[in-house]
Design a protein with these regions (language model features):
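The feature marks the mature, well-folded catalytic cores of soluble enzymes
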Residues: 1-177
Length: 177
């Protein structure tokens, strides 16, 4: 980031004062972090954005993170993402249209109810897809508990999009292929 851009951002922050809050994910470069009001993971940033009294929330992260912040934001807040091309390869592995196709195929081949579970680092359409079908979102730290919950109800699970998290969680539960 060049000095001119840094100066312009500082200038706008000074003009807008409490009307703007800049949120930055941990992985942002140091120049952005220094300009930010809050630094954290996607969940912390979404929550802190919603707690802010600012009208404008600038979310320095990827699209699904800004989308999560927008879900929690007050009606009076506008979430802005500086780079609309800032995507997450994992979140883009599947969308609700493809998930529905796969989910239906799994249901057809299964003699049990299927609960969709999506890793929280996903777009809103996937989270909505899960909620509409009695599923859930999970984090890497609670994936095992979420899967156990559905398995204890006698259900099967359709897990996406984090393949490795799904496989490693299945192994930790001693599930067969």
């Amino acid at each position: 980031m060049n000095d001119d851009l840094i100066y312009k951002i500082k200038e706008k922050k000074e003009i807008l004062k409490d009307k703007i809050t800049i949120l930055a994910h941990h992985y942002q470069n140091i120049e952005i972090v220094k300009l930010s009001d809050v630094i954290g993971d996607s969940y912390k940033l979404a929550v802190e954005g919603s707690r802010s009294k600012s009208e404008f929330i600038v979310f320095c992260g990827v699209k699904f993170m800004a989308e999560g912040a927008a879900i929690l934001a007050k009606d009076t807040q506008k979430i802005v993402i500086p780079d609309m091309k800032a995507g997450c390869p994992m979140a883009e592995m599947i969308d609700a249209i493809r998930a529905k196709e796969v989910y239906e195929r799994i249901r057809e081949g299964c003699n049990k109810e299927v609960a969709p579970v999506v890793y929280v680092n996903s777009y809103g359409d996937m989270k909505n897809f899960c909620g509409e079908r009695g599923g859930a979102t999970c984090t890497s730290s609670n994936a095992k508990k979420i899967l156990e919950y559905y398995f204890n109800q006698g259900k099967r699970v359709f897990f996406s999009p984090d393949y490795n998290l799904g496989i490693n969680t299945a192994k930790s539960l001693n599930l067969k292929k």
